[in-house]
Amino acid sequence: MRVLAAIALGATGLRGALAAVVPQEVLGTNPHIHHEQEKYLIELAPYQTRWVTEEEKWALKLDGVNFIDITEEHNTGFYPTLNSASYVKYPLKMQYADEVVALNKNLSTANMKANLEHFTSFHTRYYKSQTGIESATWLASQVEKVITESGAANHGATVERFAHPWGQFSIIARIPGQTNKTVVLGAHQDSINLFLPSILAAPGADDDGSGTVTILEALRGLLQSGSVAQGNATNTIEFHWYSAEEGGMLGSQAVFSSYKKNRREVKAMLQQDMTGYTKGALDAGAKEAVGIMIDYVDQGLTRFVKEIVTTYCSLGYVETKCGYACSDHTSASKYGYPAAMATESEMENTNRKIHTTDDQIKYLSFDHMLEHAKLTLGFAYELAFAPF
């Protein structure tokens, strides 16, 4: 997710530090090539592009500048849904309250805590690192376990390891419905320490370990529904854990680019990025709430997300803005798919320890994460049966 400009080390200092250190355990690099740094095409706003080095990418993030890296995907997206009226009609009120409330009772903070403790034990989940591959492998095994234990695998549910050239793969859990119309729930699995990405620890408990385990628990809860697990829902439901969000939404772009090329019909996408930190809001005298993005999102879908929070969560919501390219919903929008995003609070009160060694579990509220899991499950179930 976006980094706050309050991080102490400035971009200038980072450039010098990075230039002085040869990255360790970074996949796909050639230590014998020093004469010219590879450059990447980034987009700072729709159609506003710039060529930068990787070092300059991290400097921009340290300065609080969001971007999407379109080096491999330029000239492929067209942003038809940004800040526009939705072309998909979503339910005006909840249709399955009894079912969703019952399923939400099965959600467990203990499960999320146990999963996040293991997930943050990897030195870093940096997408070019060996431990980034190892963390993805562990996460995929947990997703597969949920699918298998629910019985959904016996009815066509699958877990795909979506390969990328940098090593760490994205993960897609697919629960087929009666149609191929698809609803996507997303989070990003990678972490980063912007000071020295390939060397320093990046536990990434909040960014986005919290979102990762939130939607994993929502998947487990959703599959307690026999109708969904047995493939009787109207629409197909997918849970995505993207690689390389921190590098500029690289993993999610590859996924949604593939979907567009294959004419996949995605009707809605909800991203959960940073779901566990409440201290910032409470210290500011604000109420604990679910943050709902209102910029660079599909407006109709965002209204629906607000209704989900109002109906199924114990907390209210607060509208907030994160600017362009702050998380993977940007990739869905880029390829014409309606997308929305939820986060832990208003952006000015979100976790300022992200992208450092201090993004740790001890600062998080699993009760707050539970509310995001309720949001995820309610969103998935209501739209699983929606007559698109």
From Swiss-Prot:
In short, the EC number is 3.4.11.-
Q: Where does Zn(2+) 2 bind?
A: D207, E246, H355
Give the signal sequence positions.
1-19
Q: Name one GO cellular component term.
A: extracellular region
Q: Which Pfam families match?
A: Peptidase_M28
Q: Which SUPFAM superfamilies match?
A: Zn-dependent exopeptidases
Question: Which residues of this UniProt protein bind Zn(2+) 1?
Answer: H188, D207, D273
Give all cystine bridges in this chain: C322-C326
The note on the cofactor says: Binds 2 Zn(2+) ions per subunit.
Question: Where on this protein are sugars attached?
Answer: N106, N180, N232
Propeptide residues, chain positions: 20-88
Necessary cofactors = Zn(2+)
In terms of Gene3D superfamilies, this protein maps to: Zn peptidases
Q: What is one GO biological process annotated to this record?
A: proteolysis
Annotated keywords: Aminopeptidase, Disulfide bond, Glycoprotein, Hydrolase, Metal-binding, Protease, Secreted, Signal, Zinc, Zymogen
Tell whether Signal is among the UniProt keywords: yes
Name its cellular compartments. Secreted
Q: Which GO terms of the molecular function aspect are on file?
A: aminopeptidase activity; metal ion binding; metalloexopeptidase activity
* Protein family: Belongs to the peptidase M28 family. M28E subfamily.
Quaternary arrangement and interactors, per the entry? Monomer.
Role according to the record: Extracellular aminopeptidase that allows assimilation of proteinaceous substrates.
Listed name of the protein = Leucine aminopeptidase 1
Q: Which organism is it from?
A: Aspergillus clavatus (strain ATCC 1007 / CBS 513.65 / DSM 816 / NCTC 3887 / NRRL 1 / QM 1276 / 107)
